[in-house]
UniProtKB/Swiss-Prot annotation:
Gene3D superfamilies listed in its UniProt record: 2.40.50.580, 3.40.1350.60
Listed name of the protein: Sugar fermentation stimulation protein homolog
Annotated GO MF terms: DNA binding
NCBIfam families: sfsA
Family, per entry: Belongs to the SfsA family.
Cited InterPro entries: SfsA, SfsA_C, SfsA_N
Entry superkingdom: Bacteria
Length: 239
């Protein structure tokens, strides 16, 4: 997935959920939009390098958007979680996700379930059961372990219940954890943050809901990030 042209700044603070102040190279302070409504644990430390895009819009109050954080250890994390579905759709189209490569038709944002949900992707293929794919973003990493969620997610819990119901109806049901961070080599739920989500997902896995986690890979040109892709599946390391 190609990233928009990016510029670097130093992170100062995040506030009102959707706003952040950054310091430019010339010392000026710029307020940028933050699309991530999560806790952003470990992704918003004062002094971190922020990579932002400029929409050049004359109508947006804050035309610049926070896209990536470059951490003190050099790892990159895409904090704009709106890009996760774009990333996964590209991977599905290019058959990068081997577990789902047999499907030829990809339908995004399809209504389904009994709790007024939308599935991120409904996959169809000749001779194959329909496959419901829910995408979750990995931005939280500790000790090289990718984790989800970074805050309590009642919405995520609902999605697991919906997927389990689809599995019981005979369809494939998949939770795909997409790496927006390039610093992990296995994945687990953050049970210390949301034990209910952890419990629900473990039970769903026992009943046939499939769970896959893919690492993220960033490309750079002259040290500027230019693209993000899903690299390879990583093992699950649940306790």
């Amino acid at each position: 997935m190609r990233l928009p042209p990016l510029q670097a700044a130093k992170f100062i603070r995040r506030y009102k959920r959707f706003m952040a102040d950054v310091e430019l190279a010339n010392g000026n302070i710029l307020t940028i939009h933050c699309a991530n409504t999560g806790a952003m644990t470990g992704c918003a430390e004062k002094g971190d390098t922020v990579w932002y895009s400029d929409s050049k819009s004359t109508t947006r109050k804050y035309p610049c958007s926070w896209e990536l954080t470059e951490l003190s250890n050099g790892n990159l994390v895409c904090i704009n979680t709106h890009r996760s579905n774009q990333l996964v759709q590209e991977a599905l189209q290019n058959k990068v996700i081997k577990e789902l490569a047999g499907y030829s038709e990809i339908y995004p944002e399809v209504k389904y379930g009994e709790e007024n949900s939308r599935i991120d992707f409904l996959l169809k293929g000749e001779g194959l059961p329909d496959c419901y794919v829910e995408v979750k973003s990995i931005t939280l990493v500790k000790n090289n372990i990718g984790m989800f969620p970074d805050a309590v997610t009642t919405r995520g819990q609902k999605h697991v219940r919906e997927l389990l119901a689809m599995k019981k109806q005979g369809y494939r049901a998949v939770v795909l954890f997409a790496g927006l961070h390039n610093g992990f080599d296995c994945f687990k739920t953050a049970e210390y943050i949301d034990p209910d989500y952890d419990k629900l997902l473990r039970q769903a896995m026992k009943e046939g809901v499939e769970v896959y986690a893919y690492a993220g890979k960033f490309d750079k040109i002259q040290e500027i990030p230019t693209a993000l892709s899903l690299a390879e599946v990583v093992p699950l390391c649940f306790n």
